[in-house]
Amino acid sequence: MKYLAAAIAAGLAALAASYGNGKVISKTIEGMARQPESANNLRATMFIGVGLIEAVPILAIVIGFLILFL
């Protein structure tokens, strides 16, 4: 049962993070198309946002390992 819980935690976190990354990147590209002069600022902000979004599945994988081994 704990194997299933770890798989669900990691799978749902990865699914949510990929959806979030897609939304962030698509809105950034849309903003760059509208205002090309602010592309550098948008790109930097996008990388910060993507990094914060990617922290969630990493934490979910750590929690999954804790479920498995503790």
Curated annotation (Swiss-Prot):
Functional note: F(1)F(0) ATP synthase produces ATP from ADP in the presence of a proton or sodium gradient. F-type ATPases consist of two structural domains, F(1) containing the extramembraneous catalytic core and F(0) containing the membrane proton channel, linked together by a central stalk and a peripheral stalk. During catalysis, ATP synthesis in the catalytic domain of F(1) is coupled via a rotary mechanism of the central stalk subunits to proton translocation. Key component of the F(0) channel; it plays a direct role in translocation across the membrane. A homomeric c-ring of between 10-14 subunits forms the central stalk rotor element with the F(1) delta and epsilon subunits.
A Pfam family this chain is assigned to: ATP-synt_C
Organism: Lactobacillus johnsonii (strain CNCM I-12250 / La1 / NCC 533)
Membrane spanning stretches: 5-25, 50-70
Complex and partners: F-type ATPases have 2 components, F(1) - the catalytic core - and F(0) - the membrane proton channel. F(1) has five subunits: alpha(3), beta(3), gamma(1), delta(1), epsilon(1). F(0) has three main subunits: a(1), b(2) and c(10-14). The alpha and beta chains form an alternating ring which encloses part of the gamma chain. F(1) is attached to F(0) by a central stalk formed by the gamma and epsilon chains, while a peripheral stalk is formed by the delta and b chains.
UniProt protein name: ATP synthase subunit c
Underlying gene: atpE
Cellular component terms (Gene Ontology): plasma membrane; proton-transporting ATP synthase complex; proton-transporting two-sector ATPase complex, proton-transporting domain
InterPro entries assigned to the protein according to its UniProt record, in alphabetical order: ATP_synth_csu_bac/chlpt, ATP_synth_F0_csu, ATP_synth_F0_csu_DDCD_BS, ATP_synth_F0_csu_sf, ATPase_proteolipid_c-like_dom, F/V-ATP_Csub_sf
Family of the protein in this entry: Belongs to the ATPase C chain family.
